Amino acid sequence: MNKDQAEKYQERSLRQKYNLLHVLPTLNSRALSGLYYKNFHNSVKRYQIMLPEQLKSGKFCSHCGCVYVPNFNASLQLTTNTEQGDSDELGGESMEGPKKCIQVNCLNCEKSKLFEWKSEFVVPTFGQDVSPMINSTSSGKVSYAVKKPQKSKTSTGKERSKKRKLNSLTNLLSKRNQEKKMEKKKSSSLSLESFMKS
């Protein structure tokens, strides 16, 4: 297998595992979702891929591995960290007063997790084509597609062929002849003007 084929295989297998993780909640199989979750993360480690923070922290249950789907296999509840007494789960920071949190209860394994409430809406910046799984670049890293700064324009094959045609001998001769004709026209008009002035 050459490098391109290996990258395509890697991308295909990771995409399949990722997609299966999203299909498995419909089967209601805790063991199977945990197995695929572990398999997906082992593959990510093997290929040394950096996952976005959205995939690492709050999308999957850390106990059973299923994808959180509200009102299907997870229940959401708005609470404060003082009600729960779980400030350690939010980072162990000493907080001034009660802070809003979202408590996600996994209905498969009955475990709960707290997430910090973010009141501002964060708009992700994506490139033209949103591909949240795998970039097909040579590095094969998993990340969200982001607009890259435009590089200086490089000449394409079409532009190079046009330049070759313009620089051919016949074209150069025809340009030279046209320039001579233009000079004659200008010189004749100049002589007429000079004649009129005198």
From Swiss-Prot:
Keyword Transmembrane helix: no
Chain positions covered by the region annotation Disordered: 141-198
Keyword hit for RNA-binding: yes
Places the protein is found: Nucleus
A Pfam family assignment: Rpr2
Gene Ontology cellular-component annotations: nucleolar ribonuclease P complex; ribonuclease MRP complex
InterPro entries cross-referenced by the UniProt entry: Rpr2/Snm1/Rpp21 (IPR007175)
GO biological process terms on file: maturation of 5.8S rRNA; mRNA processing; plasmid partitioning; rRNA processing; tRNA processing
UniProt biased composition (Low complexity): 188-198
Record keywords, A-Z: Hydrolase, Nuclease, Nucleus, RNA-binding, rRNA processing
Cystine connections: none
Biased composition (Basic and acidic residues): 176-186
GO MF terms held by the record: nuclease activity; rRNA primary transcript binding
Other comments on record: Present with 172 molecules/cell in log phase SD medium.
Assembly information from the UniProt record: Component of RNase MRP complex which consists of an RNA moiety and at least 10 protein subunits including POP1, POP3, POP4, POP5, POP6, POP7, POP8, RMP1, RPP1 and SNM1, many of which are shared with the RNase P complex.
Function noted in UniProt: Essential component of the MRP ribonucleoprotein endoribonuclease that cleaves mitochondrial primer RNA sequences.
Family matches, as PANTHER family: RIBONUCLEASE MRP PROTEIN SUBUNIT SNM1, RIBONUCLEASE P SUBUNIT P21
Stated name of the protein: Ribonuclease MRP protein subunit SNM1
